[in-house]
Amino acid sequence: MAHKKAGGSSRNGRDSAGKRLGIKAYGGEHVIPGNIIARQRGTTWHPGLNVGMGTDHTLFAKVEGRVEFRAKANGRTFVSVLPIAQAAE
């Protein structure tokens, strides 16, 4: 009886597609209202001035201006949009 027992299929061999998270508009870049600044899971970056946060923690611009990242003493990084009038000064 030189039989080979039927081999079971592997439990591995699947992967999920990348979710395209991360910064979409870097510091110093010009944005308009509604532009997505960052996609994230949780609050890696926190919303600052003129930045809104969606239900999935996406950060977006509320006004036209320049993106600015600022680290605070508590270890949190805040993302703000400086309006064009302020950015020019």
UniProtKB/Swiss-Prot annotation:
Keywords: Ribonucleoprotein, Ribosomal protein
Pfam families for the chain: Ribosomal_L27 (PF01016)
Disordered: annotated span: 1-20
One annotated Gene Ontology cellular component of this protein: cytosolic large ribosomal subunit
Top-level taxon in the UniProt lineage: Bacteria
Coiled-coil zones: none
Gene Ontology MF, one: structural constituent of ribosome
Keyword GTP-binding among record annotations: no
InterPro entries registered for this protein in UniProt: Ribosomal_bL27, Ribosomal_bL27_CS
GO biological process, one term: translation
HAMAP family: Ribosomal_bL27 (MF_00539)
Family stated for the protein in its record: Belongs to the bacterial ribosomal protein bL27 family.
Name under which the protein is recorded: Large ribosomal subunit protein bL27
Organism for this UniProt entry: Rhodopseudomonas palustris (strain HaA2)
